[in-house]
């Protein structure tokens, strides 16, 4: 639900320790897919490694519905809460 999604978006900022880069990419990409939909920007340039990684993670979800992305995002944040605590 939208409320669960918004709550998860707040809770992910309150984790006691920093998730791995890959975990954060998963969370970021599902957030973007849930809020924006399919990638709507050009892939960042060669030297923007972080930007490219984020874009690629988001682009990998192309075609996923916003609702499915929202559910997956909430599930991923729940998983991180269990692992890192809030």
Curated annotation (Swiss-Prot):
Name its cellular compartments.
Answer: Endoplasmic reticulum; Golgi apparatus
One of its Pfam families is ACBP
* Gene Ontology terms: cellular component: endoplasmic reticulum; Golgi apparatus
Q: Where is the ACB domain?
A: 1-86
Question: Which protein are we looking at?
Answer: Acyl-CoA-binding protein
One GO BP annotation is: fatty acid metabolic process
Q: According to its UniProt record, which protein family does this protein belong to?
A: Belongs to the ACBP family.
Cysteines paired by S-S bonds? none
Gene (UniProt): DBI
Q: What UniProt keywords apply to this chain's record, in alphabetical order?
A: Endoplasmic reticulum, Golgi apparatus, Lipid-binding, Transport
Q: What are the binding positions for an acyl-CoA in this chain?
A: 13, 28-32, 50, 54, 73
GO MF, one term, reads: fatty-acyl-CoA binding
InterPro entries listed in its UniProt record: Acyl-CoA-binding_prot_CS (IPR022408), Acyl-CoA-binding_protein (IPR000582), Acyl-CoA-binding_sf (IPR035984), FERM/acyl-CoA-bd_prot_sf (IPR014352)
Reported function: Binds medium- and long-chain acyl-CoA esters with very high affinity and may function as an intracellular carrier of acyl-CoA esters.
* UniProt source species: Gallus gallus (Chicken)
Q: Does the keyword Metal-binding apply?
A: no
């Amino acid at each position: 639900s939208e409320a669960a999604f918004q709550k998860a978006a707040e809770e992910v900022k309150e984790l006691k320790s920093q998730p791995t880069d890959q975990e954060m990419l998963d969370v970021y990409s599902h957030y973007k897919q849930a809020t924006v939909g399919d990638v709507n920007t050009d892939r960042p340039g060669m030297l923007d490694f972080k930007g490219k990684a984020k874009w690629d993670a988001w682009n990998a979800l192309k075609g996923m519905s916003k609702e499915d992305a929202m559910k997956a995002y909430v599930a991923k944040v729940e998983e991180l809460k269990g692992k890192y605590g809030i």
